[in-house]
């Protein structure tokens, strides 16, 4: 059976502000199943942003586990991400999950990959999902050549990804921490 997939999640950090946004499209094979899915959320007393891409059920499973780690480590984003990655590498069930997360708080942005790696993005810009490369390239160009806010950059980057990637639409949800 085919999995639900396809999305774009992008994060931009500039100064003391961070924005994380995603589109709303969910596809099953070549069929759009939903156009308004919410793949970006606030967790841990609204102090942490998280966006997910990949198989929907897998992403929700990882999100639940990440939230539990965040609670256990009292909101320490890096510690929670590393502990989740350790579990991901050692737990047979988790190793089969096909999803990625971008997490951000007031000071740190991290990508948690499908291999159980934790990456600190270079330049405060990261993107995942089917339109991630388009969004990341657009965000990098905008960061280097404009004075736009992180929210504006995320919005424009998602728009460009939505124009180019058939698995990404223009229904955007963007969250910020300032």
From Swiss-Prot:
Record bears the keyword Protease: yes
NCBIfam families, A to Z: ATP_dep_HslV, PRK05456.1
Subunit and interaction comment: A double ring-shaped homohexamer of HslV is capped on each side by a ring-shaped HslU homohexamer. The assembly of the HslU/HslV complex is dependent on binding of ATP.
Protein name: ATP-dependent protease subunit HslV
One Pfam family per UniProt: Proteasome
Family annotation (HAMAP family): HslV
One GO cellular component, as annotated: proteasome core complex
Active-site residues annotated for this sequence: 7
Biological processes per GO annotation: proteolysis involved in protein catabolic process
UniProt record similarity statement: Belongs to the peptidase T1B family. HslV subfamily.
Compartment list: Cytoplasm
PROSITE patterns (alphabetical): PROTEASOME_BETA_2 (PS51476)
Activity control note: Allosterically activated by HslU binding.
EC numbers on record: 3.4.25.2
Protein origin, superkingdom: Bacteria
A GO term, aspect molecular function: threonine-type endopeptidase activity
Membrane-spanning residues: none
Main subcellular localisation: cytoplasm
Annotated catalysed reactions: ATP-dependent cleavage of peptide bonds with broad specificity
Swiss-Prot/TrEMBL keywords: Allosteric enzyme, Cytoplasm, Hydrolase, Metal-binding, Protease, Sodium, Threonine protease
The species this protein was found in: Burkholderia cenocepacia (strain ATCC BAA-245 / DSM 16553 / LMG 16656 / NCTC 13227 / J2315 / CF5610) (Burkholderia cepacia (strain J2315))
């Amino acid at each position: 059976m085919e999995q639900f997939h396809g999305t774009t999640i992008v994060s931009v950090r500039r100064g003391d502000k961070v924005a994380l946004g995603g589109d709303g499209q969910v596809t099953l094979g070549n069929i759009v199943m939903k156009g308004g899915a919410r793949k970006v959320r606030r967790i841990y007393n609204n102090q942490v942003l998280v966006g997910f891409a990949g198989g929907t059920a897998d992403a929700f499973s990882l999100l639940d586990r990440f939230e539990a780690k965040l609670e256990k480590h009292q909101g320490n984003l890096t510690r929670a991400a590393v502990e989740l990655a350790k579990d991901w590498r050692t737990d047979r069930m988790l190793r089969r999950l096909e999803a990625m997360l971008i997490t951000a708080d007031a000071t740190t942005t991290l990508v948690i990959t499908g291999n159980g790696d934790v990456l600190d993005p270079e330049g405060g810009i990261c993107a995942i999902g089917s339109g991630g490369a388009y969004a990341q390239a657009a965000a990098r160009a905008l960061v280097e050549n404009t004075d736009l806010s992180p929210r504006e950059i995320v919005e424009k980057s998602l728009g460009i990804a939505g124009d180019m990637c058939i698995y990404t639409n223009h229904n955007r949800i963007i969250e910020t921490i300032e």
